[in-house]
Swiss-Prot record:
Top-level taxon of origin: Eukaryota
InterPro entries xrefs: PPDPF (IPR026754)
Signal peptide: none
Chain coiled-coil ranges: none
The gene coding this protein: PPDPFL
Family: Belongs to the PPDPF family.
Name of the protein described by the UniProt record: Pancreatic progenitor cell differentiation and proliferation factor-like protein
């Protein structure tokens, strides 16, 4: 069985590499004429870091409405009402 890293591990690794890339950018001299994008700003359309479990909640979210529809369908066909 394959091992899947936890969201905390992935988040820590992401922050580690972001910090190391920012420190390498800050170590450049002012004579270097390279433009860098500020990675500390959240990207538009992506969830915030505080909401790091959004995918987990949406993936495992169960809809109670669907189960109610199934029960209504079964009762309409007579399968749930007993032996007729």
């Amino acid at each position: 069985m394959a091992s899947v890293p936890s969201i905390g591990c992935l988040l820590a690794r992401n922050q580690y590499y972001r910090k190391s890339s920012v420190s390498s950018v800050s170590s450049l001299t002012s004579s270097d004429s390279v433009n860098f994008i500020d990675d500390d700003k959240p990207q538009q359309g992506l969830p915030e870091v505080a909401e790091s479990t959004w995918w987990f909640k949406s993936f495992f979210h169960s809809e109670p409405v669907l189960s109610n529809v199934r029960i209504k369908d079964l009762s309409a066909t007579g399968s749930l009402s007993g032996r007729s």
